């Protein structure tokens, strides 16, 4: 309600509150020098003197989720090397699930060498950090198990029986794990620690596989690979509240990422050769932004300004600038390749991607796109996890952190 001349006290209070709000909101807006150096750019605004503080008044998040640090940047907690005390002591590693070899290759990112090979269940698809960031879950899809790995020791624990775990996510409040049961055509909400089934949500689309959550955590968008559809799911109610067919014949949507400001969702499509851009709130008709052949994985830079888009069918990575709302660069892998899923190093300087059909892993310089390493691994490497990474908690997949 706007103040009136008769309510000077209210006016004064409102102005003071507004000033405090602006000051708080501004805390998380700038990028650190390390991130700019990692990407070879200069900051558009001076870096803040103090770390971001929660702005509780503006975002009414999913009950129980940690407060949003900056309503203008959902990735505000993911700045270079800002590791949580929970993960700070973990050795830096790259965990590569080899789908056709039933193993996980463990790479030391400093030497680019494989230091361990872990035998897991049948057809491991993704390595997923748990919500509390204490465990890495290997999704053994056809083996119907999840293998826990202790990121502190690198040792695998006893597999947990979970049917059809193609991919795995966690609700922002940490209350549930969400299994993308692709062949079962289900979203299965489970206990995030024991993986006990709590609720099963049948879906009418085919091939649920990737997702991301809204800024407030109250809903998430899911891609259905084999029927070319998208779902909108109410997180708290655990209910599908929207469904649409992508406007492209033969569409095969893959990875999903929300924009830093939470206003748009991007969905990679390997058959449409680009990203669908969607307003998640309205869940209206999306538009297609071409990127390259076989568009697959989407990864955010440590300063939240760019997104790295892997084009598996042509061996390239496109760079999308959120502020300019356009593609600014394209990096081509020397000798080709099949860049698929991966993640960004904790310092933001290296993009790691699996070479799905080449039995290899690529390490790329995020400033120049230069290939730093090409490492032979097992057969069918897929959703590799770079770990640890900055953030307060994990939403799953190969590492979506808030």
Give residue spans per PLM region.
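Bacterial N-terminal signal peptides
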Residues: 14-25
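Predominantly soluble domains enriched in secretory-pathway, periplasmic, or organellar proteins
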Residues: 27-402
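Bacterial N-terminal signal peptides that target proteins for export
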Residues: 2-15
């Amino acid at each position: 309600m706007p103040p009136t001349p008769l309510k000077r006290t209210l006016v004064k209070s409102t102005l003071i509150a507004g000033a405090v709000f602006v000051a708080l909101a501004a805390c998380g807006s700038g990028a650190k020098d390390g991130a700019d150096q990692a990407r070879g750019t200069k900051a558009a605004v001076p870096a803040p003197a103090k770390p971001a503080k929660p702005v509780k008044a503006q975002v009414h998040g999913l009950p129980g989720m940690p407060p949003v640090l900056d309503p203008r940047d959902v990735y505000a907690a993911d700045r270079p090397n800002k590791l949580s005390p929970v993960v700070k002591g973990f050795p830096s590693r790259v965990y590569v699930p080899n789908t056709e070899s039933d193993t996980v290759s463990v790479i030391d990112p400093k030497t680019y060498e494989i230091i361990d090979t872990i035998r897991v269940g049948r057809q491991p698809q993704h390595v997923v950090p748990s919500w509390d960031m204490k465990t890495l879950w290997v999704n053994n899809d056809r083996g119907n198990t999840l293998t826990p790995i202790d990121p502190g020791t690198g040792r695998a624990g006893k597999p947990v029986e979970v049917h059809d775990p193609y991919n795995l996510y966690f609700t922002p409040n940490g209350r549930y794990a969400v299994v993308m049961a692709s062949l079962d055509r289900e979203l299965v909400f489970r206990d995030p620690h024991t993986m006990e089934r709590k609720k099963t949500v049948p879906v009418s689309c085919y091939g649920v596989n990737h997702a991301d959550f809204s800024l407030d955590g109250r809903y998430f968008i899911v891609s259905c690979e084999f029927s070319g559809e998208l779902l909108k799911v109410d997180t708290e109610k655990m209910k599908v509240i929207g469904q649409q067919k992508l406007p492209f014949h033969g569409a095969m949507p893959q990875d999903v990422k929300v924009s830093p400001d939470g206003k748009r969702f991007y969905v990679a499509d390997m058959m449409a050769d680009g990203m669908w851009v969607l307003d998640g709130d309205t869940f209206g008709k999306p538009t297609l932004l071409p990127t390259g052949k076989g568009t697959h994985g989407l990864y955010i830079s440590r300063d939240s300004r760019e997104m790295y888009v892997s084009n598996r069918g042509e061996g390239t990575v496109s760079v999308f600038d959120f502020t300019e709302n356009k593609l600014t660069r394209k990096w081509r892998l020397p000798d080709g390749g099949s860049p698929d899923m991966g993640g960004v190093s904790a310092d933001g300087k290296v993009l790691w991607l699996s070479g799905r059909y080449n039995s290899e892993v690529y390490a790329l310089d995020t400033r120049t796109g230069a290939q730093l390493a090409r490492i032979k691994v097992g057969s069918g490497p897929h959703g590799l996890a770079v770990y640890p990474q900055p953030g307060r908690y994990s939403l799953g997949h190969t590492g979506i952190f808030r």
